[in-house]
Design a protein with these regions (language model features):
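Short acidic, hydrophobic short linear motifs in intrinsically disordered regions
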Residues: 20-33
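Short amphipathic alpha-helical interaction segments
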Residues: 36-51
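Short, Lys/Arg-rich nucleic-acid/phosphate-binding segment
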Residues: 58-64, 68-69
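A short, conserved structural fragment
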Residues: 50-60
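Contiguous, function-dense segments enriched for cysteine-driven chemistry
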Residues: 1, 7, 26, 65, ...
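Short, amphipathic alpha-helical interaction segments positioned at domain boundaries
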Residues: 70-92
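Short alpha-helical segments that sit at the start of domains
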Residues: 1-21, 77-78
Length: 92
């Protein structure tokens, strides 16, 4: 799994500053991101963040943000588990 790019982190941050963990729709998100990104880029990043688990799709074009700390925990857990296994193998 690749880590997030700067653009994706910035989009998450801008949405977080505006909505925190409240529900929002695509139009509201696009309005928030309009000064910085095109509609195409904004939609692409929102879909990607949704796929990765940083944005929950609530159906009917409604979304909510997932706490970044929770995302880091879920992402790093698998990484740390894998590193631990590899480290044990190399240490013999």
């Amino acid at each position: 799994m690749r880590w997030l790019k700067k653009r994706e982190v910035v989009v998450y941050y801008l949405l977080y500053r505006k909505f925190r963990f409240d529900k929002f729709n695509v139009g509201e998100a696009l309005d928030t991101l309009k000064p910085y990104f095109s509609k195409k880029v904004s939609m692409s990043v929102i879909k990607y963040l949704s796929k990765k688990g940083l944005i929950n799709s609530l159906g009917n074009s409604k979304y909510s943000l997932v706490p970044f700390e929770e995302f880091l925990y879920l992402t790093s857990y698998e990484y740390i588990k894998r590193r631990s296994t590899l480290r044990r193998r190399t240490r013999g």
